[in-house]
Amino acid sequence: MLIFFADPTKEICIIGSREDFGRLASLIRAAKGTMLSSQTGSPAPYDRLLGLIVIENKPGESVRFSVTQNGALLIVGDQSKLSILADNVFSISEADDSEGHWHVEYFPDHFFLAPDSFPVVFELTDAKRNQEFSSLQ
């Protein structure tokens, strides 16, 4: 799994395999945990690669994606709203399209996302292509 971050726009791009997204969905559903990601290669056209995902349960809060000062992707929210996110992330792992993607951005009255959440793109790639991509960068 690779996690790209653009500092000026706060955009996050998560590229992973079916297995990566299945593991991530399990952690999100549990509303706690951490997952390492590769920092091998260039972050271009983004500004940097993030090496860690941290998931935390925050009762009563909508889901928020942010980046900590030490470069971790932080995903927080109420367990019920994290569960909605987990269902969607898991569906990526089961997608028919081997290179599909899903945009998660706030809009007014979003059903699980907080207004100040950073925008995220989840992109599915096969494990071999993911490895090749990280070594080419």
Regions inferred by a protein language model and the residue ranges of each:
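Positively charged, low-complexity terminal tracts
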Residues: 1-137
